[in-house]
A protein has these predicted regions:
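ATP-dependent carboxylate activation and anion-phosphoryl transfer catalytic cores
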Residues: 1-150
């Protein structure tokens, strides 16, 4: 399961995810309670993402410090990260460092929250998409017309 999707969906769950999976694994029907509204997940990445280039990773990203201007929100999920001498740093080679999630009653509110949370993150050479959720107005109309949403 793509970790961006699972981190984003987990943010919308009221039911603890551990309990949900325990019930599922035990053959019980899990009681899934979720928040109303929308969730958006945005990947914070560094070079070489989206490419596989060990030399670029070694030169620009390996062991780069991950700093938060203020204590991070609960909805920041780590990916290729490790602790080195008490400091969170970039690890792995995928270039995917964090998944930041925003929630809101509307798509615009979820967008505002996720991008506000991203402003709290400082990683050398980091980048991320700034258009997540922008097409929701058109996409939701299509999904309604196709009968997928009611």
């Amino acid at each position: 399961l793509d970790t961006t999707i699972s981190s984003t969906q987990q943010a919308g769950m009221i039911t603890p995810i551990g309990q949900f999976f325990l019930d599922l694994a035990s053959g019980n029907y899990p009681k899934l309670r979720v928040r109303s509204g929308f969730q958006i997940g945005v990947r914070i990445v560094v070079p070489p993402f989206p490419f596989d280039d060990d030399e670029t990773f070694e030169s620009f990203s390996k062991n780069a410090a991950i700093v938060f201007r203020k204590p991070p929100a609960d909805e920041i999920h780590i990916e290729d990260v490790k602790q080195l001498n008490g400091q969170w740093v970039v690890a792995g080679t995928s270039g995917v460092i964090l998944i930041v999630v925003g929630l809101g009653q509307t798509m615009k509110q979820a967008q505002a929250q996720v991008y506000s949370r991203i402003k709290n993150v400082l990683i050398p050479n980091m980048y991320y998409r700034t258009d997540i959720g922008d097409r929701w107005d058109q996409d939701s109309d299509r999904l309604h017309n196709w009968g997928i949403l009611r």
